UniProtKB/Swiss-Prot annotation:
Residue ranges constituting the SCP domain according to the UniProt record: 57-199
Subcellular location field: Secreted
Main localization category: secreted
Post-translational modification (record): Contains 7 disulfide bonds.
Protein name, as recorded: Cysteine-rich venom protein
A GO cellular component entry from the record: extracellular region
Amino acid sequence: MNLALFIIFATIFENVVPENCPKMYRRLSKSHTFCTPSTCKIEAGGKVTESDKQTILETHNQLRNKLATGKENQYQKLSSAANMMQMEWDDELAAVAQAHANQCKFEHDSGDQRAVGNFSVGQNLLETSGIFSIDWGKVKIWYTTEVDDFYPEYNKPFQFHGSYGHFSQVIWAKTWKVGCGVAGYVENGVKKVLYTCNYGPAGNLVGSEAYQVGSPCSACPENTKCSATYPGLCKSITPDGPQIRRPSSKDYLLYCDFSDKDPKACKDVTMTGSRPFTTQKLYTGKYVTQVFNAGENMTINFGKFEHKGGLCAFLIGRFGPNVAGETAASEVNFHFSAPHLIFPEGMKETRPITSWHTIGILMRWDKELQISYVFKVKPPTAKPPPQYFEFKEYGVKGGSCP
């Protein structure tokens, strides 16, 4: 993220009021934490200083580096990590975390309430009482008091349990961004300090893996290299952070993600409709997006494809009401045609999910197919609210859907 974007974020975050809640947050949640005004008196904290940021990053990265280099053997020997990222500060995560701390409630908000556009968001909380003393070094207890409960066999497939949930988020290899907030307040006559840290991408994904076992830095993601400061961690080369490796062309008849690596065939996929897409940026690349009104539509024409094992035209996207809680009134219809064949109508996706997911269907047909997908909003007679439609990857995969 460049300096200009940081300035924009800072301006928005400092001046927001509920009625001016950012459009993205209104889309992601009916009650986004960032847009929820504080109803308590903040006696201390209220922001994280530059010195505090360094303490937070050093604390996290030192602990991650300890595990990644195979030096965590206090209770049981934990294997070294091949792909553990060095954490960086994120202003947007911090702004949402500060808004959470300002609620003066020692309880997690929900995933949608702390959601941001770039990635899923995890969260760790700590509350201290007695005096208004802010010490970010204390958050190391998320690691030190729970590491003894995390056994090597819990790593893959990852098994979640509350006894080590803070620890597993701290050491989750693919998490590379952190942002925190802090607030001191009085509750029932007792002085308390609430520390909130939000993480992206979120960890604690059941069935996944906390980290890849192997020699330190032996499996660093694209656009990262072994850190000079923390030799067990993979450090981002550019502000965009770790990048996803493009899938093998052996598995895909066509794969496009709006990057410079897209093959020329991606330009043969046409996108026409009521209004053109606009292009937006994520850490991991670009995506196209648009808000459509009643009766409007967008057609993605993939063209003709053939595969002996069947094929799946797909979008990695999301759609639904532009304001969370309003009526879902849109769908993606799947259209297929081939000479002398009639395919059933009514094949469609109607789930209004705010997370990125595969939109598509596998067709068990080994002859050439003409494929198009149509996003559409219900007609004006139904009085639907505006609906958004966006996707970051598209293509055709042989034999299965991504």
